[in-house]
Regions:
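Cytosolic covalent-transfer regions centered on His/Cys nucleophiles
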Residues: 1-156
């Protein structure tokens, strides 16, 4: 997967430079509302229910300040990713018990006919496994800076 292909799932309206929420449930709701406000999902309540259900199976807080809540839902019409930052951090139940600051919400249609969902999840985890990339992402203040950081992570 190329940087451009990965970036095609993001968008300026799906870039949140500072989350207002300070709780896990609040973050999930705030990120789901980004998609709802954009008109990218059919039923915001259904989407939020799906995200919460997925979290109940086990936290998507990966550790090292990163959380990747994700899931497939009949509310989603297309695969989309929301990127959000929390400078203060949020207790997300991460594996290392550290607060999360970088959030990637991946939402895909229930019938993922393009088989995008799992490769996207894997690629994001791979990209943020690099400490230097995580540090640069914490400093982004615009969608342009975010896309540049992702391109650099791919060596482009």
């Amino acid at each position: 997967m190329t940087a451009e292909r990965l970036l095609s799932y993001f968008g300026e309206s799906r870039f949140v430079p500072e989350l207002r929420s300070r709780s896990k449930d609040g973050v999930l709701g705030e990120m789901a509302r980004v998609l709802a406000d954009e008109g990218e999902i059919g039923d915001p309540a259904l989407l939020l229910e799906m995200i919460r259900r997925r979290e109940s199976l086990g936290s998507t807080g990966l550790g090292k300040g990163v959380a990747v809540p994700h899931g497939r839902s009949t509310a989603a019409t297309d695969t989309r990713i929301v990127f959000a930052l929390s400078k203060k951090g949020v207790d997300f139940g991460a594996l290392d018990n550290e607060p999360c600051r970088l959030f990637f919400l991946i939402v895909a249609p229930y019938e993922d006919r393009k088989h995008e969902y799992l490769p996207l999840l894997g690629k994001i985890v791979e990209v943020v496994s690099d400490e230097a990339v995580r540090e640069r992402l914490l400093q982004v203040d615009s969608f342009g800076a975010f896309t540049q950081t992702i391109r650099e992570a791919f060596g482009e």
